[in-house]
Amino acid sequence: MSEDRPSRSGDGNKILYCSFCGKSQREVRKLIAGPSVFICDECVELCNDIIREELEEKSQSARSSLPKPKEILEVLDQYVIGQQRAKRTLAVAVYNHYKRIESRHKNDDIELAKSNILLVGPTGSGKTLLAETLARLLNVPFTIADATTLTEAGYVGEDVENIIQKLLQKCDYDVERAQHGIVYIDEIDKISRKSENPSITRDVSGEGVQQALLKLIEGTVASVPPQGGRKHPQQEFLQVDTKNILFICGGAFAGLDKVIQQRCTEAGGIGFGVKVKSSESKRDVGKVLAGVEPEDLIKFGLIPEFVGRLPVVATLDELDESALVKILTEPKNAITKQFKKLFEMENVELEFRQDALSAVARKALKRKTGARGLRTIVELVLLDTMYELPSQEGISKVVVDESVIENKSEPYLIYQTMPAKVASGE
């Protein structure tokens, strides 16, 4: 309020005072009126300084708590076996992404662009697990979306805005937290367009979805209804800025290795791609995928604009038998450790022989399900035992060997020393 502004009662001679510092309107440049209170320009500046200092302290605290790439890699190593190249790429990309968010609070002419990530690897190689572990490490909201369920707006299926809706649900509709979250879009290869040439007809679940995802991934303000969908047109929409949300897209991209080999062959055999003689060689296929270029992804069926918004590409190798055996035993939440914990709750020790672990790995390789199929195999083998065990007494140990995995025998049950009256048949 200016100095010559009349009082609320209409008495122009009444002197007004700041409700916070007590200075009169004659001692300050400006006095702003509110409902029964006044605040001067000096108090407004002081409030701004306090808020600015708190933001800087919060930024410094976040920076100190942000794990370094080596620390990120160490945590990933605890949960994901192998895939060192992909883990290093992810560690650096995630670290740079959150450094970029912190840099927004500084007065700098250089604006850092967002680097979303594309994970390319066979099914069951650890793509989803990598994304989940990163989100858990960074303590940020995380959601998984299935690209095959997405369609263009106006068609039956999920709109791309539903992805942000799921992210909001994960953090109880805290918009600020959601704007720093991680979104993993699975099966991204399934929305590739049907041919390399632009479609002249509607492809609502392929190229159309890629077009719809462009702005969301790059950064836009999405209007999301709190209760989802468009069933409540009268409700107030939440405005979520996606420019600081990290998008990780993953897919198996079956056949991409052949596209890469064809490019290398047409180029006169330059590079390691020409060394691949058979697509059945798992190691060689992994090496071929490591040489993926944007043009290969475009030829596979992703539109150029979409590929351009996923500048960081990490490729995963197909898992061999030794890697699958390690996955069964080494990670913090390894499958065998989980089942041993379940049996411990019944006061029974569970033992997996080495030949059993190898048999499980071979079975998963034969089914071509990767690490994802390991749990199914172990679950089926132990199903009858887990059904009977709670009702039985005196069992101290259950042993699983190769013959059990091959369904040639039941798990071996080792009993404790029976009480005398039980042994006598009473």
UniProtKB/Swiss-Prot annotation:
InterPro entries from the xrefs? AAA+_ATPase, ATP-dep_Clp_protease_ClpX, ATPase_AAA_core, Clp_ATPase_C, Clp_protease_ATP-bd_su_ClpX, ClpX_bact, P-loop_NTPase, Znf_CppX_C4
Which GO molecular function terms does the record list? ATP binding; ATP hydrolysis activity; ATP-dependent protein folding chaperone; protein dimerization activity; unfolded protein binding; zinc ion binding
* PROSITE patterns listed in its UniProt record: CLPX_ZB (PS51902)
The residues covered by the ClpX-type ZB domain are 6-59
GO CC list: HslUV protease complex
Does Nucleus appear among the keywords? Answer: no
Alphabetically sorted, this entry's keywords are: ATP-binding, Chaperone, Metal-binding, Nucleotide-binding, Zinc
Set out the biological process GO terms recorded for this chain's protein: cell division; proteolysis involved in protein catabolic process
Disulphide bridges, residue numbers: none
Chain sites annotated for binding Zn(2+): 18, 21, 40, 43
Chain's role: ATP-dependent specificity component of the Clp protease. It directs the protease to specific substrates. Can perform chaperone functions in the absence of ClpP.
Give the family this protein belongs to, as stated in its UniProt record. Answer: Belongs to the ClpX chaperone family.
Subunit details: Component of the ClpX-ClpP complex. Forms a hexameric ring that, in the presence of ATP, binds to fourteen ClpP subunits assembled into a disk-like structure with a central cavity, resembling the structure of eukaryotic proteasomes.
| Name of the protein this chain belongs to | ATP-dependent Clp protease ATP-binding subunit ClpX
Q: Per the UniProt entry, what species is this protein from, by scientific name?
A: Xylella fastidiosa (strain 9a5c)
The gene is clpX
